[in-house]
């Protein structure tokens, strides 16, 4: 890409920062010539240059005045003197001439933006060398210089007719003003930039540590699974057992200590007691009576209902 394109991009990027505009937008101009009448007809017209720019307005006639309407096309980019050059061509019964008028007006810099304003300007005629061909009494046509005269005679007689010297303009315009909002400079910009960079670096470090921890944990699980079962359950790892073996065929790990159940010990059956303690049920022996349980000498276990007296 050529350097000129880079320069254009940089210029466009800087426009909102440095570009300001303070000018006017001319909407209507009313033109009146001090002598003779002008109109919008082809033989009696006027053209107006604004700052040497030939804007094309809409023309309307009203009596001895014409109105130029620009519809927002006549934009002036500053509030300095606005120069007008008016060219008038008049061909009427009592007045025939073509003249140029020049002048300027200064817009009011104190006018409020985007409000309609009015101003007036007087344009002076550029006299130059004015010549006219007249007929003398002898019938001969003679060209005379009327540059220093305020009146020009008609060709048919020596009676002078008034000559136009000035043109009056009334300008309606809108003050256009645009100024980019000033950016407040942050004095702590360097510190803020450093803090942002440090924050980004800290986030990157934490992300790296988290990723490394995840990878190590995954590797440990893979190693443990491979050591216990002979295969790795990770999708990204290689199976270490033959394809014919299924996961359900692999038994769970066993401790060698419990590979076989313990052998029961051989112990003699304990002898059955014939007489229990006083706190236990008495088991009768073969020599004892079936009706009466054996008792001790103190008669502890005598039947309390054995005699009628007990009732």
Swiss-Prot record:
Transmembrane segments: 189-209
Cytoplasmic side: 210-311
Ranges of biased composition (kind: Polar residues): 287-301
Tissue and organ distribution: Expressed in the intestinal lumen. Also present, at lower levels, in the excretory duct cells.
Biological processes per GO annotation: endocytosis; regulatory ncRNA-mediated post-transcriptional gene silencing; RNA transport
Stretches the record annotates as Disordered: 287-311
Subcellular localization: Apical cell membrane; Cytoplasm
Signal peptide (UniProt feature, chain positions): 1-20
Assigned keywords, A-Z: Cell membrane, Cytoplasm, Endocytosis, Membrane, RNA-mediated gene silencing, Signal, Transmembrane, Transmembrane helix, Transport
Organism domain of life: Eukaryota
Record's GO cellular component terms: apical plasma membrane; cytoplasm; plasma membrane
Extracellular side: 21-188
Transport keyword on record: yes
Record's bilayer topology term: Single-pass type I membrane protein
Result after altering residue 168 to E/R: Reduced dsRNA uptake
Free-text note on domains in this protein's UniProt record: The extracellular domain is necessary for the uptake of dsRNA.
Additional record remark: The avoidance behavior is transgenerationally inherited, and thus progeny display this same aversion despite never having been exposed to this pathogenic bacteria.
Its biological purpose: Plays a role in RNA-mediated gene silencing by mediating endocytic uptake of double-stranded RNA (dsRNA) ingested from the environment into intestinal cells from the intestinal lumen. Selective for dsRNAs of at least 50 bp. Required for avoidance behavior induced by small RNAs derived from pathogenic bacteria such as P.aeruginosa.
Official protein name in the record: Systemic RNA interference defective protein 2
Taxonomic source organism: Caenorhabditis elegans
């Amino acid at each position: 890409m050529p350097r000129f394109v880079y320069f254009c991009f940089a210029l466009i990027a800087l426009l909102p920062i440095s570009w300001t505009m303070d000018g006017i937008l001319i909407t209507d101009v009313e033109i009146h010539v001090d002598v003779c009448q002008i109109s919008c007809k082809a033989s009696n017209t006027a053209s107006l240059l604004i700052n040497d720019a030939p804007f094309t307005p809409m023309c309307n006639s009203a009596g001895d005045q014409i109105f130029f309407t620009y519809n927002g096309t006549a934009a002036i980019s500053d509030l300095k003197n606005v120069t007008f050059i008016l060219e008038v061509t008049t061909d009427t019964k009592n007045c025939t001439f073509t003249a140029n008028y020049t002048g300027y007006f200064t817009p009011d810099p104190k006018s409020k933006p985007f409000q309609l304003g009015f101003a007036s300007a007087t344009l002076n005629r550029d006299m130059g060398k004015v010549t006219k061909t007249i007929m003398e009494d002898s019938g001969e046509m003679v060209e005379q210089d009327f540059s220093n005269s305020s009146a020009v005679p008609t060709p048919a007689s020596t009676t002078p007719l008034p000559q136009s010297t000035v043109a009056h303009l009334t300008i309606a315009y809108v003050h256009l003003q645009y100024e980019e909002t000033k950016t407040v400079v942050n004095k702590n910009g360097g510190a803020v930039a450093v803090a942002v960079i440090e924050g980004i670096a800290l986030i990157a470090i934490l992300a790296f540590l988290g990723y490394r921890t995840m990878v190590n944990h995954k590797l440990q699980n893979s190693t443990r699974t491979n050591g216990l079962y002979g295969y790795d359950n990770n999708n990204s790892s290689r199976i270490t057992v033959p394809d014919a073996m299924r996961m359900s065929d692999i038994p769970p790990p066993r401790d060698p200590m419990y590979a076989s159940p313990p052998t029961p010990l051989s112990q003699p059956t304990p002898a059955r007691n014939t007489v229990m303690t006083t706190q236990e049920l008495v088991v009768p022996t073969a020599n004892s009576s079936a009706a009466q349980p054996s008792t001790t000498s103190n008669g502890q276990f005598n039947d309390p209902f054995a005699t009628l007296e007990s009732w």
